[in-house]
Swiss-Prot record:
Entries under CDD domains matching the protein: ABC_6TM_MsbA_like
Stated name of the protein: ATP-dependent lipid A-core flippase
Keywords on record: ATP-binding, Cell inner membrane, Cell membrane, Lipid transport, Membrane, Nucleotide-binding, Translocase, Transmembrane, Transmembrane helix, Transport
Quaternary assembly: Homodimer.
Positions of transmembrane segments: 28-48, 80-100, 182-202, 267-287, 295-315
Gene: msbA
Provenance organism: Shewanella frigidimarina (strain NCIMB 400)
């Protein structure tokens, strides 16, 4: 049985408060400041009764049970009138100090909480399996770090201020009313449950709509990100109108969800005020009763009336901030669901500095998560240390899947095993396993940094300038790097947008060379190069593959003629195998592909 919404909210709130525990000193100071702020407001209203009853009367004044002395011709009511300005200045000075302390402490906690939560979400992304990232909307993933954490900050910040301060003020005002006339104040007990029902119903609505707003905001982020990444394609294919319409739809959906929240909020606040007005009207009416007149003085009535009026604003604030609080709770639920997602399994215990590089696939069958059809069926091959195996086949045949399984990017196999140096890759610690592999894929990823830092990214320790230059030379990247004004210190832009496709590919190859891993995966590593560059860099790749176990995925068959073994993959199965000469002699799929490429 699932937990009720109220219990779920309480569980989420307690988990959120766990982030505040390291800042308990700040939290205590903030609460004390908020309580003081509310108490001063209550004290100011409480001061109305003695000010009116005693300050304007001709009888000795008693304030806080103490007879005020008379002196120098000034009677008691004169002393009350002299005390009032001083009391007001002192109270509001204390109120100002309390407001500063509480606001600063809450702002500090909110900023720290949002930083800690964003850091935790970001780090958790790095531990999640590739399959999770594949199936999730990138806009939603980004929204978790940006939009959702902002909503949480509001719940922990402005909502906390209002809940503590306004609750304290409302309780203080209620206490004053019952202290001065419990009979006249009983009407509050009648409207209290009605207000509670309204707030409960509205809270559920706020929480539901808030989750819909988060989803809509994820759509806005995803659509914007997609347009920016495909900006050139949008322009060249004239897709501006399509993109504008697509963004309008997600943008309008986000507006609609926000309006649903605004409607609920705009209805709830006046409704609370109307309910409160009935209580106020009842007090005014009850004050005319003969039974009440004997207990009421002008000061008592003014204090009760002032307390009721002063209590309406905190109640209104609590209703208003309830929307922010529910949005924060909804965002917390989404973020905590993400943080509760199981990280990439890492049950291996075996660790090694460097393997020899013997790689074997033993009857491997694999299906992607959520897919019934197997991507690979009964794959068997072995690569001896320092040897090269090339994978050839149509797009979608399973070549990249084989490469992804070597690094354990995806979960367990359906059948079979993959061994590295006669040890199952699932027995290795993930970090140790991936330290043995260098990868150059057809989708080059460069970071918004210098060329030098992008090349050095894959190196596990400190790297010298000479090592970076040497790797770039082997990748034939120095040819274009030397022509740049800042050389290796040139900024490449986001994902290398300031470089050509071939230049980005060479930097990626230089990065793999610098890593110096015993196992090398080249997934269409020369696909973005022109013919002249391909011939030049092929020499560098031949040097890179020397004494390294290499898995080469290629469509250009000219780049794999020297491979020790070539596997032809079709529909997840190995349909042909052998070296270049043997496969040509077989006159099968490989021979046909080779003939087609070289006849063009």
């Amino acid at each position: 049985m699932s937990a009720s919404p109220k219990n779920e909210m309480w569980v989420v709130f307690k988990r959120l408060m766990a982030y505040v525990v390291p800042m308990k000193a700040m939290f205590i100071m903030a609460v004390l400041g908020l309580i003081t702020y509310g108490a001063v407001d209550a004290a100011f209203i409480a001061f109305i009764k003695p000010f009116i009853d005693e300050g304007f009367s001709q009888t000795p004044a008693i304030v806080a049970g103490v007879d005020l002395p008379t002196h120098g011709g000034f009677n008691a009511n004169k002393d009350i009138m002299l005390m009032a300005p001083i009391a007001v200045i002192l109270m509001f000075s204390l109120r100002g100090v309390a407001n500063f302390v509480s606001t600063y402490c809450v702002s500090y906690m909110s900023a720290q909480l949002i930083m800690d939560m964003r850091q935790q979400v970001f780090e958790h992304y790095l531990r999640l399996p590739v399959s999770y990232i594949d199936r999730e909307n990138s806009g939603n993933l980004i929204s978790r770090v940006t939009f959702d954490t902002e909503q949480i900050a509001r719940a922990s910040g402005s909502a906390l201020i209002s809940i503590v301060r306004d609750s304290m003020t409302a309780i203080g005002m209620l206490g004053i009313m019952f202290y001065y006339s419990w009979k006249l104040s009983l009407c509050i007990l009648v409207i209290g449950p009605i207000m509670g029902v309204v707030i409960s119903v509205v809270s559920k609505r706020f929480r539901k709509v808030s989750k819909q707003i988060q989803s809509a905001m994820g759509g806005v982020t995803a659509t914007t990100e997609q347009m920016i990444k495909g900006h050139k394609n949008v322009l060249v294919f004239g897709g501006q109108k399509t993109e504008v319409e697509r963004f309008f739809q997600v943008n309008d959906r986000n507006r609609y969800q926000n309006m649903k929240l605004a409607v609920a909020q705009s209805i709830s606040q006046p409704l609370i005020m109307v309910i409160g007005s009935f209580a106020l009207a009842f007090v005014l009416y009850a004050a005319t009763w003969d039974s009440m007149k004997t207990d009421l003085t002008a000061g008592t009535f003014a204090a009760i009336l002032g307390a009721m009026l002063a209590m309406l604003q905190p109640i209104k604030n609590l209703t208003r901030v309830n929307a922010e609080f529910q949005r924060g709770i909804a965002a917390c639920t989404t973020v905590f669901e993400l943080l509760d997602t199981a990280p990439e399994p890492d049950n291996g215990v075996f660790s090694i500095d460097r393997v020899e590089g013997k790689l074997a696939f033993d009857n491997v069958t694999f299906a992607y998560p959520g897919q019934e059809k197997s991507a690979l069926n009964g794959i068997n091959f072995e690569v001896k240390p320092g040897k090269t195996v090339a994978l050839v086949g149509r797009s979608g045949s399973g070549k990249s899947t084989i490469a992804s399984l070597i690094t354990r990017f995806y979960g367990d196999l359906s059948t079979g095993d993959i061994r590295l140096d006669d040890t199952s890759i699932y027995d290795y610690q993930l970090k140790s396993l991936r330290n043995q592999v260098a990868l150059v894929s057809q989708q080059v990823t460069l970071f918004n940094d210098t060329i030098a830092n992008n090349i050095a990214y894959a190196y596990p320790g400190e790297v010298t300038r000479e090592q970076i230059v040497h790797a770039a030379e082997l990748a034939y990247a120095m040819e274009f790097i030397d022509t740049l004004p800042e050389g290796l210190d040139t900024q490449v832009g986001e994902n290398g947008v300031l470089l050509s496709g071939g230049q980005r590919q060479r930097i990626a190859i230089a990065r793999a060379m610098l890593r110096d891993a015993p196992v090398l995966i080249l997934d269409e590593a020369t696909s973005a190069l022109d013919t002249e560059s391909e011939k030049a860099i092929q020499k560098g790749l031949d040097n890179l593959r020397h004494n390294r176990t290499s898995i080469v995925i290629a469509h250009r068959l000219s780049t794999i003629e020297s491979a020790d073994e070539i596997l032809v993959i079709d529909q997840g199965k190995i349909v042909e195998r052998g070296n270049h000469s043997e496969l040509i002699a077989q006159a099968g799929i490989y021979a046909n592909l080779y003939q087609m490429q070289f006849s063009q």
